[in-house]
């Protein structure tokens, strides 16, 4: 078990700060339904949240042996960004939870920076994050590659093993673990299937929470364990 001190808290954005994954999924499924059977699309994409839209397109093209129209990618991404920017709600309790934790905070997301900034504003976390926003368009490879998490740690001058991550997706958990960081799995967003906690546990998360009210105590417990406090 990693017992080095925790010096930086890094949060995913979609599905952790804001309840956006279900909105993006709706847009993508509606857009792809003209090109493949919807029921089969839903089965294929079940549990793929956390992937970039481009990775989802590649998955669909491979599975159905089709080539999607080049303009569809940008159209659906724009639709999803607009819907999220105007309609997304913060995850219940996230602002209160993050403001009660006395650690520097960053966000590391598979979305584009302008989209992450919009979601941060919707969650009223601009001041708490203090500009520490890291996104897929800032790195060579998106999650599940560790690039965006490593960039956050490097920029803030914290060793990866001293970072604690909050993630909702298997994709994000794999990225954070590949970066050498500890992970708290969050299963409280509206898109999360009932068995998802088991999936995240099997990947190796350090702890699981189902509501943001649990986050401060969970972080405190992990910090105490690292310092020999329990």
What are these regions (language model features)?
Residues 1-44, 63:
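Active-site neighborhood of HAD-like aspartate-dependent phosphohydrolases
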Residues 2-7, 99, 103, 112-230:
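Asp-based, Mg2+/Mn2+-dependent phosphohydrolase catalytic module
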Residues 16, 109-111:
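Conserved phosphate-coupling serine/threonine residues in phosphotransfer and NTP-handling enzymes
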Residues 21, 42, 88-91, 123, ...:
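A short, glycine- and basic residue-enriched loop/turn
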Residues 29-32, 52-67, 119, 153, ...:
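Helix-loop "lid/cap" segments that line or gate small-molecule binding pockets
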Residues 31-35, 93-103:
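A short, Lys/Arg-enriched amphipathic alpha-helix followed by its capping loop at the start of a domain
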Residues 34-38, 64-67, 124-128, 157-158:
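Short helix-capping segments at alpha-helix termini
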Residues 38, 58-96:
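Metal-dependent phosphoesterase signature
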């Amino acid at each position: 078990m990693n017992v080095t001190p925790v010096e930086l808290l890094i949060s995913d954005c979609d599905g952790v700060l804001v309840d956006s994954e279900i909105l993006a999924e709706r847009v993508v499924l509606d857009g792809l339904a003209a090109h493949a059977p919807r029921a089969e699309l839903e089965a294929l994409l079940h549990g793929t949240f956390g992937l970039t839209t481009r990775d989802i397109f590649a998955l669909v093209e491979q599975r159905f042996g089709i080539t999607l129209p080049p303009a569809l990618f940008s159209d659906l991404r724009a639709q999803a960004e607009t819907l999220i920017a105007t309609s997304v709600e913060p995850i219940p309790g996230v602002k209160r939870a993050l403001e009660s934790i006395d650690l520097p905070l960053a966000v590391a997301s598979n979305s584009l920076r302008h989209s992450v900034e919009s979601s941060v504003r919707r969650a009223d976390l601009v001041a708490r994050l203090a500009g520490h926003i890291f996104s897929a368009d800032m790195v060579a490879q998106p999650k599940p590659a560790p690039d965006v998490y490593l960039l956050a740690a490097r920029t803030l001058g914290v060793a990866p093993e001293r970072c604690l991550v909050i993630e909702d997706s298997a994709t994000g958990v794999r990225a954070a673990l590949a970066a050498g960081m500890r992970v708290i799995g969050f299963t409280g967003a509206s898109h999360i299937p009932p068995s998802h906690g088991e999936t995240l546990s099997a990947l190796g998360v350090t702890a699981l929470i189902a509501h943001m009210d649990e986050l401060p105590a969970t972080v405190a417990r992990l910090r105490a364990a690292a310092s020999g406090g329990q």
